[in-house]
Amino acid sequence: MNTNDFDFELPEELIAQTPLEQRDASKLLVIDPVTREMTDTHFDHIIDQLNPGDALVMNNTRVLPARLYGEKTDTHGHVEFLLLKNTQGDQWEVLAKPAKRLKVGAKVSFGDGRLTATVTKELDHGGRIVEFSYDGIFLEVLESLGEMPLPPYIHEKLEDRDRYQTVYAKENGSAAAPTAGLHFTPELLQKIEAKGVKLVYLTLHVGLGTFRPVSVDNVDEHEMHSEFYTLSQEAADTLNSVKAAGGRIVAVGTTSIRTLETIGNKYDGQLQADSGWTNIFIKPGYQFTVVDAFSTNFHLPKSTLVMLVSAFAGREFVLEAYKHAVQERYRFFSFGDAMFVTRPSEK
């Protein structure tokens, strides 16, 4: 498979720069790979795609205001950090700019010294391990000094930080939002639950690699980034019960899919309480063991996320659906519209 097989034309003006005023007012394209039908609707009608006895699985990670601007304590040169993951204690892996000036031992100050960082290790591609020093609680200091790490294709300033969080965001740790969940409102979730659908939460902390383009021609040579996930025993039991009773596992977003499939692959299609790092790469040819249907946003051309959707619904049909979305002026990427995909019945 060639990376160019997953390319498509996307006018730049269709890349959503700001969220809609009402979360669930976004458009929803429902696609069925078996009948090859496509239906244009709105996200608040996603409830029509869910049946009593199904489980809706959402990623409750919370985005950290992970972009920090500071200065080197010796030269006062400007420095930018993007926090990627907490390695241990007060140590974090960060993406640093300009990295070449930040050798081991370099100190960086943020917010007039309220937060300082010492470089303890140099990594590839501008990565650094740093140890932070501060007074009080780290997350509170970060909330006051940090900025939301919006994706590189969003150029507008975000007026309200909460619009880059899902309404059910709970577990701190992501460098990017699980954007398929941004469309849900508390009222919509209440209606879905009242219909007899189980609401289930897992956690996968989204890393910066989610935006990393595929730089190789041969898809099989691409290496996925690792992300940390957790599924509780209660959630696993609920999902196994739903499956056993003939209900569907409906995932919200690619992060939920990757978590469920990672665990399902470990335990022969069953789910158990589990946590760890996953670098699962789902591409055409992959056999799904857990997920029966899902919602997702519209993704970048040639991205691993388009490949994942293609693994589920077929590359040609997915590209047809994307072409339809472009013609119908759907909004793309993080603040854009959504797609609901049912699973081919022959699998």
Curated annotation (Swiss-Prot):
InterPro entries: QueA, QueA_dom1, QueA_dom2, QueA_sf
Keywords from the UniProt entry: Cytoplasm, Queuosine biosynthesis, S-adenosyl-L-methionine, Transferase
Localization per Swiss-Prot or TrEMBL: Cytoplasm
Disulfide bond among keywords: no
Major location category of this protein: cytoplasm
Gene Ontology biological process terms in this record: queuosine biosynthetic process; tRNA wobble guanine modification
Pathway annotation: tRNA modification; tRNA-queuosine biosynthesis
Reactions listed under catalytic activity: 7-aminomethyl-7-carbaguanosine(34) in tRNA + S-adenosyl-L-methionine = epoxyqueuosine(34) in tRNA + adenine + L-methionine + 2 H(+)
EC numbers: 2.4.99.17
Gene Ontology MF term list: S-adenosylmethionine:tRNA ribosyltransferase-isomerase activity
GO CC, any one term: cytoplasm
Subunit structure: Monomer.
Purpose: Transfers and isomerizes the ribose moiety from AdoMet to the 7-aminomethyl group of 7-deazaguanine (preQ1-tRNA) to give epoxyqueuosine (oQ-tRNA).
HAMAP family linked: QueA (MF_00113)
Family listed: Belongs to the QueA family.
Protein name in UniProt: S-adenosylmethionine:tRNA ribosyltransferase-isomerase
Organism expressing this protein natively: Streptococcus thermophilus (strain ATCC BAA-491 / LMD-9)
